[in-house]
A protein has these predicted regions:
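Catalytic-core regions of core metabolic enzymes
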Residues: 1-368
Length: 368
């Protein structure tokens, strides 16, 4: 389906999630969000739907200019990230990443861990993959001595046994097959990335066939998460077609492959958060009757929002400490209060007509 909700006057995103979660023809849900009318309902619907199928989110309005255009609150992006993670969703940054991520999550089995093993026929593409993995806070696997010994016996003298495993630029398809067969016997990693750079000594199509054959005939071949990156836009077209036909995910660049792997990692982390019960503090004390009385008084007075000094008593009723707040009618009174309590102080504009004071320079910090 392709569904546009317009201004969401009658049907909102949470209604849509409830429907798509139960729809047997829907395997994944892709969301574009600007704002929410009911955050609580959205999180509830998202948590329920994400237990059954992957949900990917693009949230616009990250820049001040976009926030102004969309009339959305500034400074809310960290809250969006926290809600998306807690609901078991995956947030992506652009449409290219959106479709790449849904392709990865829809066709690959979930990861059982986050450790990555890299095999390459050159240091350069492996280094690019490592840089991207480091930037995204990914984890490299550590090879056991048993696996290292098996690789030394299987590979030519001179190949450094490490992660990444650089088979060198003269690696043949047989070297790829030997290395992968040894690694398939190992439990040291959670995902295997195989990289190939085109060279005269190492034809890409033959190496691709060797990898497919190794996975096909090994008992663990269909249970291991394998990602492939055969570099070369035209020279590796046939290899990428073979991988697609074999059901193996394949990517054009080392960075793109790492991005796909980290999508799986982040999705795994968020799904883990989805299943966790929030930890409650041992010494939680709440005077709910006092809080209810304060809120009821505000409702009786016709208030629809609470000022900073009005929120503080409600928070204190739940044991949440806040900084003391004073109200000044003019600048002279503000100076007098500041001299009484001591500098530095923060000054905030008080106006019911301006919901976001910082947007009009209505918040000044560290005044002396």
């Amino acid at each position: 389906y392709f569904i546009a909700l317009g201004d969401s006057l009658d049907i909102d995103v949470d209604d849509l999630l409830d429907f798509l979660a139960r729809d047997s023809k829907t395997s994944a849900i892709l969301l574009y969000l600007e704002h929410l009318s009911d955050a609580r309902r959205f999180v509830s619907a998202a948590r329920s739907a994400s237990r059954n199928k992957p949900i990917l989110v693009i949230k616009s309005g990250r820049s001040p200019a976009a926030q102004k255009l969309l009339h959305v609150n500034s400074g809310m992006d960290p809250a969006w990230d926290a809600a998306i993670q807690r609901a078991g969703l995956l947030r992506v940054q652009d449409t290219h990443e959106l479709f790449s991520a849904v392709e990865t999550l829809s066709h690959m089995r979930p990861l059982r861990g986050e450790k990555l093993m890299i095999v390459s026929n050159g240091a350069a593409p492996a280094a690019l993959a490592l840089d991207e993995l480091w930037l995204r806070n990914g984890k490299l696997a550590t090879l056991s001595e048993e696996t290292r010994d098996a690789l030394r016996q299987a590979l030519p003298v001179g190949v450094e046994i490490a992660n990444p495993l650089d088979l060198r630029d003269d690696a043949s398809s047989e070297h790829y097959q030997r290395a992968v067969n040894v690694l398939l016997n190992s439990q040291d990693y959670d995902a295997l990335l195989v990289i190939h750079s085109p060279s005269a000594a190492a034809p890409g199509t033959e190496s691709a066939l060797a990898l497919i054959d190794a996975l096909k005939h090994h008992p663990r071949g269909k249970y291991v998460t394998v990602l492939t990156n055969w570099c070369g836009e035209f020279s590796s077209q046939e290899a990428r077609r073979l991988f697609s036909d074999a059901g193996l995910p394949t990517y054009r660049t080392p960075e793109g492959t790492i991005t796909a792997f980290m999508h799986m990692v982040e999705y795994r982390r968020n799904q883990k958060q989805l299943r966790e019960t929030p930890v409650l503090p041992d010494s939680l004390t709440a005077n709910t009757s006092e809080a209810h009385a304060l809120l009821q008084q505000a409702i009786d007075d016709g208030a629809t929002t609470l000022d900073t000094h009005e929120v503080s008593p409600v928070l204190r009723a739940y044991g949440i400490h806040t900084l003391p707040t004073w109200i000044a009618a003019d600048s002279a009174e503000a100076v007098h209060i500041a001299e009484q309590i001591g500098y530095p102080v923060a000054l905030k504009l008080r106006s019911p007509d301006i919901p976001h004071k910082s947007e009009v320079q209505g918040v000044m910090l560290y005044l002396r």
